[in-house]
From Swiss-Prot:
Enzyme Commission number(s): 6.1.1.22
CDD domains given in the database record: AsxRS_core (cd00776), EcAsnRS_like_N (cd04318)
Species for this entry: Xylella fastidiosa (strain 9a5c)
Gene: asnS
Homology family: Belongs to the class-II aminoacyl-tRNA synthetase family.
Record-level GO BP terms: asparaginyl-tRNA aminoacylation
Xref: InterPro entries: Aa-tRNA-synt_II, aa-tRNA-synth_II, aa-tRNA-synth_II/BPL/LPL, Asn-tRNA-ligase, Asp/Asn-tRNA-synth_IIb, NA-bd_OB-fold, NA-bd_OB_tRNA
Protein name: Asparagine--tRNA ligase
The keyword Metal-binding appears for this protein: no
Pfam families according to UniProt: tRNA-synt_2, tRNA_anti-codon
Quaternary context: Homodimer.
Keyword annotations of the record: Aminoacyl-tRNA synthetase, ATP-binding, Cytoplasm, Ligase, Nucleotide-binding, Protein biosynthesis
Localization, UniProt: Cytoplasm
Source lineage: Bacteria, Pseudomonadati, Pseudomonadota, Gammaproteobacteria, Lysobacterales
Cross-referenced NCBIfam families: asnS, PRK03932.1
Amino acid sequence: MTVASVEQMFSGKIQVGSEVTVRGWVRTRRDSKAGLSFVSVSDGSCFAAIQVVTPAHLPNYETEVRKLTTGCAVIVIGTLAPSLGQGQQFEIQAQSIEVVGWVEDPETYPIQPKQHSLEFLREVAHLRPRTNLFGAVARIRHCLSQAVHRFFHENGYYWITTPIITTSDAEGAGQMFRVSTLDLVNLPRTETGGIDFSHDFFGKETFLTVSGQLNVEAYALALSKVYTFGPTFRAENSHTPRHLAEFWMIEPEIAFADLAEDARVAEQFLKFLFKTVLEERTDDLAFITERVEKTTISKLEGFIKSPFERIEYTDAIKLLERSGKKFDFPVEWGLDLQTEHERWLTEKHIGRPVVVTNYPEHIKAFYMRLNDDGKTVAAMDVLAPGIGEIIGGSQREERLEMLDIRMAQFGLDPTHYQWYRDFRRYGSVPHAGFGLGFERLMVYVCGLSNIRDAIPYPRAPSSAEF
């Protein structure tokens, strides 16, 4: 007898006529006039559930099988057979059904066999993976996570695990969560009345990381090609459907690379991810295309086929100014591009993904390399139709004197970044990298309208349940 997953059965890995054991949860059950029950069982291994044909002569048919409701856990032993019903390839002809776990009160069970609103499902995030949509999202998230590691491994990168607790603000924006074990009722004070963090666990003020980039640069300058992929945190009090307080970031870093090489890798990387998910999660993407976003599959296929357009920020501003379109946000050299500007460029004017380069120095981070014009930095944003910015990156400032000037402009204390300055003192080389918010990627692939649906347990202002 073979313990088999539903995915193995539908992919032909289990021979028809084999005796199998399947373990999963009931989606639906219905009785027939012929004295049978049809129980739909899902184990989460793929989008589909398998129909279990249950005859009335089973010893627990009346006492248990006919009382099964959505969510009950069962172990089924039976024979895999071609299905006589429409819309399904196989079924299991049951020899026994063991009920492992009952749903305590079927009437109040939150996940009923009907369509629920996304707002409601966020309130029961611990149960929402049992729905069709969030089961699909979870499998796609796994597929893309594995594809991230596969791409970098196959291209000679090393995965570096960067710290979650840090003393540095990688973005220089100050939107950080403080980490402390101090007694909030009896805080130690300095002579000037400030909090004395020398009494804290680490002996200094510490935070949750906003980016692994600064740390991973150290390894790029020793191992040449590296990346980090882990959780990051931003204490940005934003309630929009585009922001999370906790999210995952993919950040490669490449030694001896300039901005052009950075953009080339970003394009290659995104196309690899989309090609992989199209090949490996066909069933889940088909459901999303049917129920969530009808252009999902064609959008990803078009992205893969399209060469990325390259355009400088200055030229992008000129195009927007000449567009004749009235935008909600002003278009002016020196201001950052907003989502509406990015989407106009990719969807209305150019019609494919765009890499915008060389932004004004005052709207980008301190570590980005100052260009020879003294006004712009070697920064890039990859813009995608339907979402806008999906990747942000830059060539890093490898010149110590210029880095110090940039840090001073941002009001950063150089003593907190002495270790980062060391990279420029000892064998400095040009290097570049980018960041891709994993949940932003998930939103794009799955056609989601709210980023809180792209992560298992969303963390946002006034929201830290489960």
